[in-house]
């Protein structure tokens, strides 16, 4: 970058220009348009709390209109469920600095691909499906036969439930066949419709009409005002599952709203409390735990994915115990003695480990949303806490230990847990990596030379990306992935691939690691085009990588403003020749995997 600066502005001293940017007063062009900061009533002490307020501005893509963050997801979709490809901020809701799209925006801006937007969005056309689905009074039996229902329920429990066991299978099946009484009619119908819709989604059939009909039927059941005037465990289960299905259908804000309602309803039911004196059965108590921790991991994960604060209660206000690591046959409605937990993995091991992960790390995700950013020292300190958590995992989840067996549900739970761990590590060091690559001093504690810790931070971030790519490639090479496995594989490997892109583009060709980074990118593209060849989002992601790495001259490059974080306005990007941004899904949206 120094060479480019010297070529374009030979009479300007780079170091002096940077120093000038950091010394500008309150009325300078770089700060005059800043909004007042909201008071922070519960800030975690940081050595960088007042340093370099502009450090996170590179991530703040804002629409031109005051209502530009408004969203309407029953229209043609502008958002993607992974919050990784929606570069244009208008119509997608606010996506903060832990969202994957933050990385993509910053990377594209750093490359100088776009500087202003001259054309507005095309008029959004209401989806025909939105007009056709007036299903509130339609009986479920008119949509699908009893035999098809049974097949969809099997699909749900064989594919989705083994990853997210929030619904007790034996109880649900007994209620479905009316062997035991069903819960409140409307909440049960909403849960049944959502389970059927997820079962259809898991089948990944080319004909999506059945999946669409079942999804909209579940939505219509939730539109009745009586649904928000009552609360029960079945309704919370339905909301949790409906939120996740909405996200998988590229309706992230719709899903987020369902999660918000589910959290409030769960709190009203006391699911976050153990209540040991309550005279309920062991299975009923355990099911309350499973629903609470299922909601906890979904809301935590979605908030981090969308770059929004996690508003769940912390350990200081929760006393509900973790889910038991037991097999289903060990706990039935008639069980009166608490079963002993097994030392081997069960369907509930992944839920238990991931809920522990979020309890211990949610403060990290929230800290990363700070407007002032974090210092390298604080990032390394938080990483140590993250590393300490990983060492507390049971041996069957330790990456250094061989798997105890090779059943697919266990291998996926084990792999996904580490993909999530490495992804948070990538996010943790992202600001440092971007600042280093852009040739700008990132935040550091007072008295510390700005680049002393750069290499350590970069190495941790790049290693996390490399381990993600290797692990995902190995996993997909050994199995025929289910649709839910494919979705998470694309999500995590795309984030990791952008780290490698940044490392390659920031390197001057002298790094001995360059061939390894290039090999990792080739692995990612092979995963997208071969191991996930039937996944539309994988194909789009591979195309994005090709476009990013395609040589393109920088036209009209303003070096001084490029170095000024306050000038990073992503709302002013053009849809230029070839329309790079159209491949991100906001002009030509496609269905999720």
Question: Where are these predicted regions, by residue range?
Answer:
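Intrinsic, low-complexity transcriptional activation domains
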Residues: 1-161, 186, 190, 209, ...
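Fungal transcription factor middle regulatory core
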Residues: 65-69, 73, 80, 85-126, ...
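Amphipathic alpha-helical protein-interaction segments enriched in hydrophobic
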Residues: 232-240, 286-289, 351-358, 410-431, ...
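C-terminal transcriptional activation/regulatory domains of eukaryotic transcription factors
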Residues: 107-108, 112-114, 119-234, 241-251, ...
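Eukaryote-biased recognition of C-terminal alpha-helical segments
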Residues: 522-567
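Classical protein tyrosine phosphatase
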Residues: 249-265
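Alpha-helical solenoid repeat scaffolds, predominantly canonical TPR units
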Residues: 214-217, 221, 258, 265, ...
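Intrinsically disordered, low-complexity transcriptional activation domains
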Residues: 68, 74-88, 92, 485, ...
């Amino acid at each position: 970058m120094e060479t480019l600066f010297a070529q374009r502005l030979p009479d300007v001293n780079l170091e002096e220009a940077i120093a000038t940017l950091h010394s500008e007063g309150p009325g300078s062009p770089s700060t005059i348009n800043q909004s007042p900061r909201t008071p922070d009533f519960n800030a975690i002490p940081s050595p960088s709390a007042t340093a370099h307020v502009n450090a996170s501005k590179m991530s703040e893509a804002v629409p031109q209109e005051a209502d530009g963050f408004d969203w309407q997801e029953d229209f043609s979709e502008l958002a993607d469920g992974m919050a990784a490809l929606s570069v244009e901020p208008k119509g997608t809701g606010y996506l903060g600095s832990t969202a994957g799209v933050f990385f993509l925006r910053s990377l594209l801006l750093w490359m100088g691909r776009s500087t202003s937007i001259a054309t507005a969005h095309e008029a959004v056309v209401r989806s025909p499906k939105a007009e056709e689905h007036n299903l509130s009074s339609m009986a479920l039996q008119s949509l699908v036969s009893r035999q098809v229902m049974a097949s969809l329920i099997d699909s749900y429990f064989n594919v989705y439930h083994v990853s997210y066991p929030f619904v007790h299978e034996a109880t649900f099946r007994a209620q479905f066949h009316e062997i035991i009484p069903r819960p409140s009619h409307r909440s049960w119908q909403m849960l049944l419709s959502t389970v059927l819709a997820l079962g259809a989604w898991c089948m990944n059939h080319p004909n999506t009409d059945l999946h669409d009909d079942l999804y909209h039927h579940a939505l219509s059941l939730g539109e009745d005002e009586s649904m928000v005037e009552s609360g029960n465990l079945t309704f919370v289960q339905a909301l949790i599952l409906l939120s996740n299905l909405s996200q998988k259908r590229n309706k992230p804000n719709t899903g987020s709203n369902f999660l918000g309602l589910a959290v409030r309803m769960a709190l009203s039911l006391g699911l976050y409390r153990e209540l040991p004196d309550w005279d309920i059965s062991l299975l009923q108590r355990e099911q309350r735990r499973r629903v609470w921790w299922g909601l906890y991991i979904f809301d935590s994960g979605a908030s981090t994915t969308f770059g929004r604060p996690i508003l769940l209660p912390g350990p200081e206000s929760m006393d509900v115990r973790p889910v038991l690591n037991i097999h289903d046959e060990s706990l039935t409605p008639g069980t009166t003695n608490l079963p002993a937990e097994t030392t081997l993995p069960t369907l509930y091991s992944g839920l238990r480990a991931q809920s522990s992960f979020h309890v211990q790390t949610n403060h990290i995700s929230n800290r990363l949303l700070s407007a002032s950013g974090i210092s390298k020292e604080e990032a390394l300190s938080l990483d140590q806490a993250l590393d300490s958590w990983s060492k507390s995992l049971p041996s069957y989840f330790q990456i250094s230990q061989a798997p105890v067996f090779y059943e697919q549900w266990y291998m996926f739970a084990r792999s996904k847990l580490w993909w999530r761990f490495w992804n948070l590590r990538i996010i943790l060091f992202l600001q440092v990596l971007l600042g280093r690559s852009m040739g700008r001093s990132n935040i550091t504690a007072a008295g510390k030379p700005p680049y002393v810790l750069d290499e350590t931070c970069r190495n941790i971030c790049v290693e996390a990306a490399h381990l993600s790519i290797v692990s995902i490639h190995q996993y997909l090479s050994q199995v025929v992935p289910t649709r839910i496995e494919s979705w998470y594989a694309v999500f995590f490997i795309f984030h990791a691939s952008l780290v490698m892109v940044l490392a390659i583009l920031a390197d001057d060709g002298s790094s001995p690691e360059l061939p390894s980074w290039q090999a990792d990118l080739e692995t990612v593209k092979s995963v997208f085009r071969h191991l996930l060849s039937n996944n539309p989002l994988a194909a789009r992601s591979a195309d994005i990588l090709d476009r990013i790495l395609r040589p393109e001259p920088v036209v009209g490059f303003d070096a001084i403003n490029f170095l000024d974080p306050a000038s990073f306005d992503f709302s002013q990007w053009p849809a230029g020749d070839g329309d790079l941004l159209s491949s991100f899904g906001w002009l030509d949206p496609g269905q999720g995997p």
